[in-house]
Amino acid sequence: PHRKLLEQIELVIIDEISMVRADIIDAIDRILRVYSHNLREPFGGKQLLLVGDVFQLEPVVKNDEREILNRFYPTPYFFSARVFGQIDLVSIELQKVYRQTDPVFVGVLDHIRNNTAGAADLQLLNTRYGSQIEESEADMYITLATRRDTVDSINEKKLAELPGDPITFEGVIEGDFPESSLPTSQELVLKPGAQIIFIKNDFDRRWVNGTIGVIAGIDEEEETIYVITDNGKECDVKRESWRNIRYRYNEKTKEIEEEVLGSFTQYPIRLAWAITVHKSQGLTFSRVVIDFTGGVFAGGQAYVALS
């Protein structure tokens, strides 16, 4: 079924391209050539649309893989893929900044992004160092940290500080749903007062992926969690389902169809006094504390956290 699917697709879109390794791109090229029965043309003659910012997070390469990659590629970035030596990429640069409106801050971010930041930029950022943030329901903030253990430690500590016993909500897996693909914990431990982040857009548009909130109450009988979002809106949150989907090509209808292999059902939230910079890429927060304890360990981390 995969062969027919790959043969029939016309356009391949890859988002967050900065995090895709060169060897993955070459593998995609080879697979598309073989299954499109078109060995001559790059990507089997398919259109390829790459979206992202190479100044954001870099590809993740484990130490044992790095040694092998270095033998074949000058960098792990997608643009070092060998296939790009055979084609002319058309580059389209987006100019307008939508996330920030302060021109001075946009300028500082540009300097950090291009590695041209100077003393004046650092001085401006340092005016925010050690700033006290008012903790109230109307003034939620989130800590971005580079290390997962820092994030876990902050969330566990904050949860333990809240009064009352924690409540554990068991997620339900049906069929095939790999643990590595779970969007939130299968055992979700929460308390009233806990700060959370939504990890899925709401069908009724009450929240989006990345909205911060505080748990106002938990009704176990009704299986409802009541959340006040950072803009003061009260929402009742029910369990949601995620699907593990495989795509296949239908010979009779000549259409691409979805095959659901399994599902995961859980509340679309996770603890969020802190999250990793990697998890924050693509999200927008109104109030942020950045914890660079231990420094950054990957290219683009500082820029992604600040932007």
List the model feature ranges, each with a label:
Residues P1-S307:
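Conserved ATP-binding/catalytic motifs of P-loop helicase motor domains
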